[in-house]
From Swiss-Prot:
<dbReference type="InterPro" id="IPR002019">
    <property type="entry name" value="Urease_beta-like"/>
</dbReference>
<protein>
    <recommendedName>
        <fullName>Urease subunit beta</fullName>
        <ecNumber>3.5.1.5</ecNumber>
    </recommendedName>
</protein>
<keyword id="KW-0963">Cytoplasm</keyword>
<keyword id="KW-0378">Hydrolase</keyword>
<dbReference type="GO" id="GO:0009039">
    <property type="term" value="F:urease activity"/>
</dbReference>
<comment type="pathway">
    <text>Nitrogen metabolism; urea degradation; CO(2) and NH(3) from urea (urease route): step 1/1.</text>
</comment>
<dbReference type="InterPro" id="IPR036461">
    <property type="entry name" value="Urease_betasu_sf"/>
</dbReference>
<dbReference type="GO" id="GO:0043419">
    <property type="term" value="P:urea catabolic process"/>
</dbReference>
<dbReference type="InterPro" id="IPR050069">
    <property type="entry name" value="Urease_subunit"/>
</dbReference>
<comment type="similarity">
    <text>Belongs to the urease beta subunit family.</text>
</comment>
<dbReference type="GO" id="GO:0035550">
    <property type="term" value="C:urease complex"/>
</dbReference>
<dbReference type="Pfam" id="PF00699">
    <property type="entry name" value="Urease_beta"/>
</dbReference>
<comment type="subunit">
    <text>Heterotrimer of UreA (gamma), UreB (beta) and UreC (alpha) subunits. Three heterotrimers associate to form the active enzyme.</text>
</comment>
Amino acid sequence: MIPGELLPLEGEIELNAGRETVTLTVANTGDRPIQVGSHFHFYEVNAALNFEREPARGMRLDIPAGTAVRFEPGDERTVTLVPLAGSREVYGFNARIEGPLDGKGKKAKGKNK
């Protein structure tokens, strides 16, 4: 073995196997492309993305880590979301939650509802 060498096992790796998912249709109503990364709290994405937000609370895109989905102006596409894991606390992004997802995090406000 060479230091740093990877010896992958045979077969495929299924991402997020057995996890609950939500599928939403999302439209970019803005005049610029919007890109959303794999671990961004989807509930808090750019307000120009039009979709039913409440089912996206506590969810992220079901795509490989480090990748993103790009929404061109006027585009509409279907995305699959999976729940954020770990401590399920959200801070930053667009400051719509700022705390635990499964408890007392503040509710959404403003245009991003």
